Curated annotation (Swiss-Prot):
Protein purpose: Involved in the central benzoyl-CoA catabolism. Catalyzes the addition of one molecule of water to the double bond and the hydrolytic cleavage of C-C bond in the alicyclic ring, 6-oxocyclohex-1-ene-1-carbonyl-CoA (6-OCH-CoA) to yield 3-hydroxypimelyl-CoA.
Catalyzed reaction equations: 6-oxocyclohex-1-ene-1-carbonyl-CoA + 2 H2O = 3-hydroxy-6-carboxyhexanoyl-CoA + H(+)
The protein's enzyme class: hydrolase
Induction: By benzoate.
Pathways per UniProt: Aromatic compound metabolism; benzoyl-CoA degradation
Species of provenance: Geobacter metallireducens (strain ATCC 53774 / DSM 7210 / GS-15)
Protein name: 6-oxocyclohex-1-ene-1-carbonyl-CoA hydrolase
Annotated GO biological process: benzoyl-CoA catabolic process; fatty acid beta-oxidation
Subunit structure: Homohexamer.
Length: 381
């Protein structure tokens, strides 16, 4: 009987059709701020599976915490499309440069300086954003979110669109919408109720309070978490988070919650004194890629398609009217919130005076440029 590699050499077609939409390098669309790399896939024994790769899609905007610009969104769409149709790709690893941020969502500078007050432009931007989320959900390969740092706002939304998430435990998660002039309707309001239940989804989507990677694992938002902090040459759990017990004296779950007061500050000091090492994160990601490799490819794709259906159903049901609302919201609250974040500083803060705004609206005060200017953090000081 002929060997498998002999059969492949004899029967594989001499020409393969190209199913990419456009023939462009991903990096060329955004000055290299999204990188596309094919890294050799490995078997369980560590040997390279010749001709098979894992596609790494890497956000490279660390100065702005890997937030995505319009051009980066275009590149991400192209990258996922490329990985999806590449016959040699086993799995996709979606991540960011550095150890501070996976992604913090849309680029607030661009939002504040270009899209604020321009709903017709933001509506077109949201077409691209929607296509980005759909590209992740529609990828023919398993998608792993390698959470190298904080995953906030739109970053949390594109992260939850992935099939698996593995985080280093210094990473924080959460939404930012109502605190900064928006609503988390770019995927979070679709995915969170499915993943964590209605009450916890409500907490995350409205209060905008960040939570730890350990809590994300407990809630079911990520599938695994690994330490990244080394103190004295040894890995230790995030010292700002409760990880040594599950319940408090009243029976309430405290595992994964942030410590308070002096204990939290002490933990912050330990982080500053230690070193960040993402080697365990990379080992976990590589291990998962190998597990995915050792499966039938079409059965894997079908399993992904079926298991994604709850997310896809909610997403497709809401994405178009969400796009319309987000565009119109750029005339008032988003216009105000994004400007406040962009123009504010550490000294002035990056949020408006919410009580003053509510007091004004309660008296029927119209949205005017004068009102918006008066609410800016710099005006309050």
């Amino acid at each position: 009987m002929a060997r498998t590699d002999e059969i492949i050499a004899r029967t594989a077609p001499g020409h393969l059709n190209d199913h990419n939409l456009i023939d462009r390098e991903v990096e060329s669309l955004c000055d290299g701020m999204v990188k596309y790399e094919k890294r050799p896939a490995k078997r369980h024994d560590g040997s390279v599976a010749e001709g098979i790769y894992n596609a790494w899609i890497i956000l490279d905007n660390p100065k702005q915490y890997n937030s995505y610009t319009t051009d980066m969104v275009k590149a991400i769409i192209l990258a996922f499309r490329r990985a999806s149709v590449d016959r040699s790709v086993n799995a996709v690893v979606f991540t960011g440069v550095g150890d501070k941020a996976f992604c913090t969502g849309g680029n607030t500078k661009e939002y504040a300086e270009y899209y604020a007050g321009n709903p017709q432009e933001y509506r077109q931007y949201m077409r691209l954003f929607n296509d980005m989320v759909s590209a992740i959900l529609g990828c023919d390969k398993a998608v792993i979110s390698r959470v190298n740092g904080m995953r906030i706002g739109g970053g949390q939304e594109i992260g939850m669109a992935c099939d698996f998430s593995i985080a280093q435990d210094l990473a924080n998660f959460g939404q930012a919408g109502p605190k900064h002039g928006s609503a988390a309707i770019g995927g979070a309001t679709d995915f969170l109720p499915l993943m964590v239940g209605c009450e916890q989804a409500m907490v995350s989507g409205t209060l905008c309070e960040p939570f730890s990677a350990h809590k994300a694992a407990r809630l079911g938002i990520i599938c695994d978490v690994v330490p990244a902090l080394k103190v004295g040459g040894k890995f230790v759990a995030n010292p700002t988070v409760v990880t040594d017990r599950y319940l408090d004296e009243y029976g309430r779950v405290v595992h994964g919650e942030f410590k308070a007061g002096a204990a939290f500050k002490e933990g912050q000091g330990q982080i500053k004194e230690g070193e960040i090492d993402l080697s365990l994160l990379d080992e976990k990601v590589e291990s998962l890629c190998t597990k995915l490799l050792e499966t039938f490819p079409e059965c894997m794709t079908k399993s992904l398609e079926e298991l994604r259906k709850p997310k896809l159903h909610a997403w497709n049901l809401n994405k178009e009217n969400s796009r319309a609302w987000l565009a119109l919201n750029m005339m008032n609250e988003a216009r105000t919130g994004f400007r406040a974040f962009n123009e504010g500083t550490k000294e002035t803060g990056r949020e408006i005076d919410f009580v003053k705004l509510r007091q004004g609206l309660a008296k029927g005060t119209p949205w005017t440029e004068e009102l918006i200017e008066s609410l800016m953090p710099t005006a309050q000081k």
